[in-house]
Amino acid sequence: MSHPLIKPAKIKEFACKQSKYSIAPECPFRAIAYGPSGSGKSVLLQQLILDVYKGCFERIYIWSPSIDIDHVWDPVKRYIRKELKVDTKKEKCLFSTYNPKELSEVMDRQFKIADWMKNNGKNVFNILVIIDDFADEPSFTRQSKLLHQLYIRGRHAFISTITSVQKATTLHPLIRSQATHTFTFRLRSMQDLETW
């Protein structure tokens, strides 16, 4: 008895900018940074933007309650203004509170841009969405359909997403299962490790 030869049909492939480090996750990625307070998650996010993925993203959008008070974000803000040449007064990309309308607008715009670029060439712009420490808003981290969409469909629009949390249980299981990469810091209990 013969077996069918299963091979995918040829389709148009698209490219995007990648990290200069071969060990870094390939864009677009869906990641979770996971560790207790003070473990270094924000420093990791800063270094991913300023070194590991420098020059890979056309836009960077950050949702963080501490975006205006944590100085670790200052070099990132300068990078967005000076290197990416974003006028942050005209084009908002740093958010201290979660408003679903703002995230929806970012996603809709990127889906349209990616669709146009796919129809007109081979290379597509990447964007990065960072959700940093919204554990005190479970309506966002556990119930936001938009956040779920980033982890399910964001890759089709070349949206890389990193969600940073102190406890994995603050994230919906769908997000945990769809993450392509995790950055796990030293955990404080066996229960945290067993969550995965």
Residue spans of the language-model regions?
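Short coil/loop residues immediately preceding or within conserved phosphate-binding loops
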Residues: P28
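Intrinsic disorder/low-complexity detector
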Residues: S2, K10-I11, K89, D108-W116
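Conserved P-loop NTPase motor cores
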Residues: K17-S19, A31-S39, V43-D51, G55, ...
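Conserved nucleotide-state-sensing and coupling region of NTP-binding domains
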Residues: Q47-Y98
